[in-house]
C-alpha cells in the first residue's frame, strides 16, 4: 500500500514522497535523489531523533502515513578523528571517510614524524589494513584509533629450553625485530639449533605463540630482552579422552582417541564419526569450557596427552529466519541454530541462483557483520530473526592484450585498493596502473561506488610507459588564406596530456592553443586526458583541425525551465561559460554543473572539445550548498 511521507531539509524545504512501508531507507534516499538531485552518499535521514540505516525499512522504524523525516546533508569535506598513542597522547587528524589507512599513516607522519612502516593502527580491537578505507571500517566523525609503534631497530630476546634438551646452552640469544613473525623466530631457532619449526612450541607469559595469521612479536607484547620458553612437540601419537555430557542423545561409554597434536578439530570429529558413527555435523567439542573450531589444531588449544574433551550433541530443531536485501526482497530460510553463517550464505545462493555467491555476501544482524565460521546460535539468532544482506560484487579488468581478470570487490573499495588486488593477480605495481571506465580515468582516492561501477562492470587497464615515443600530427599551416596540409613529428610520452601535445604543436608550427582541435580514431581529444587514455602509441597519427575565430550563440536551460542565451566562442572553456552565467544570473561558478548530452562538462575543457556548436543547448544544475549539522 502506497503512503505519502515528507522529508524536511534544514532550510525548511519540504519534499513529498510516495513510498511503501516496506521500502528500505536506501530506496527512500534514491527517491530523494531522483526528485532533488542530492547524491545518496550525501544524505542523512533522521526520524524521532535517530539516524536511519540504509538496510532497514520504514516499517522497521514505525514510519507511517504523513510522517516527517529530517534530511541533513553530509558535506563532501573532511571529518575529525583522534589517534591515541600508548603513552596517552592524542593526535587530531582532518580526514575523509574515503581516505585509505595509508593516507592516515601519512598524515600521522606529517604531524609526528613517525614513518608509516613503523605504525600499526587499531580500531575496535582490529588492526587496520593499508589498502582499506576509513569507511570500510565504519570509522566516523570523532572516532578514536589507537597507534602502536613497530620498533624498526633490532632487539635481543632470550629463548629458554626445558631440561632434557641437549642444546649448546640452556638459553639462546636471538637478534630479532618486533615486526618478526613467530614463524620467523622459529626459523632463526632452526638455523641455530637444527630444530624444525613444526617441532617447536614457544611460550610467553603462559601463552603459546602461534604461527597462524602471521602474528608478530609485537602482537604478543614481546619486547627487548624478553624471555620465551621453548618446548618440544612430540611427533609420536598420543591419547586423549572424549567424554559424553549427560544430556547427549549418544549415551554410549566415553571414548579414547589416538591423535597427534597437529590434528585439526575436524580430524578429531572424523575419528569420532569413524569410531562411533556420530555424524560430524551433530556434535561440538568443548575443552576448558571453550567450543573448539574445526580448522584449529589440538596444539592450538594446548590439548596434550591425557587431556579430556567434552562432546555435546546438537539436536535437530529447525526454525525459520528471514534474510532481507537492499531491494526489499525477503528470503525465507529453514535453518538450525548451529548452522554456520557460511551455511546460511550457501542457502541464500541455492534460493537465489548463481548470484549472490557466498563469497560476495555480507550478512548483518543488529548492525554487526556475521563471520563465516560462527553459528547462528553464537550470535543469538533465533526463530523469525531478520538478517540483512549486503552484496559484494565481481568486476572484470581487461588488459591491453585482451586478457581478462576477475576481482571480488565492494562498492566502497577505493581505486587504490582495486589496484592492489590487481597487483596480487598480475604483479604490476599500483603506480604503473591506469584504470579506465567508460572512457574516464579512475582516481586512487575515489571509490567504485563514486564511479557507479556495479556488478560485472568491466574496467580497462593500461600501464604507464616510462620512456618517450614518436607520434605524427597531420596539421595545417597557413600562408595568407590558403591552408597547406603538413605532417609534423613530435617526441612525447604516453603520460603527456592533450594540452601538453597542443603546446608542442604551438612550438613547432605556431598554431595558438585555443585554435587547435585534435582528433584520433574519430574522437575529439580532451585537454586534461593523456595519450595513454586514448591508447595513442608509438607511430600513431593524430589529426589537427584549425578552429576559426568568431562568436556563436548557445542556450543554457535550468531545471525550472528558464533559458539563458550566451554569446561564446568555441575556444571558450567551460569555466569561461560559467563566468558568463554568473555575470547574467549571479550564480557562482562553484554552484554550477553544466550538462551536455548527459555528460557533466569539466571546467578546463573547451566548447569545441565537446563539439558544442551554434545554438546548442546545455543544461544547468545547481549544487546545493548546505551546512552540516550533527545530532
UniProtKB/Swiss-Prot annotation:
Cross-link Glycyl lysine isopeptide (Gly-Lys) (interchain with K-? in acceptor proteins) mapped to chain: 78, 154, 551
Subcellular localization(s) per the UniProt record: Cytoplasm; Nucleus
Domain of life: Eukaryota
Residue ranges of domain Ubiquitin-like in the record: 3-78, 79-154, 155-237, 238-318, 319-392, 393-468, 469-551, 552-627
One GO cellular component term: plant-type cell wall
Keywords for this protein: Cytoplasm, Isopeptide bond, Nucleus, Repeat, Ubl conjugation pathway
Pfam families: ubiquitin (PF00240)
GO biological process, one term: ubiquitin-dependent protein catabolic process
One Gene Ontology molecular-function label: mRNA binding
SUPFAM superfamilies with a match to the protein in the record: Ubiquitin-like (SSF54236)
Propeptide position ranges: 628-631
InterPro entries, per database record: Ubiquitin-like_dom, Ubiquitin-like_domsf, Ubiquitin_dom, Ubiquitin_ubiquitin-like
Main location (coarse class): cytoplasm
Cited PROSITE patterns: UBIQUITIN_2 (PS50053)
Function: Ubiquitin exists either covalently attached to another protein, or free (unanchored). When covalently bound, it is conjugated to target proteins via an isopeptide bond either as a monomer (monoubiquitin), a polymer linked via different Lys residues of the ubiquitin (polyubiquitin chains) or a linear polymer linked via the initiator Met of the ubiquitin (linear polyubiquitin chains).
Note: Ubiquitin is encoded by 16 different genes. Ubiquitin is generally synthesized as a polyubiquitin precursor with tandem head to tail repeats. Often, there is one to three additional amino acids after the last repeat, removed in the mature protein. Alternatively, ubiquitin extension protein is synthesized as a single copy of ubiquitin fused to a ribosomal protein (either eL40 or eS31) or to a ubiquitin-related protein (either RUB1 or RUB2). Following translation, extension protein is cleaved from ubiquitin.
Protein family (similarity comment): Belongs to the ubiquitin family.
Name of this protein: Polyubiquitin 8
Gene name for this UniProt entry: UBQ8
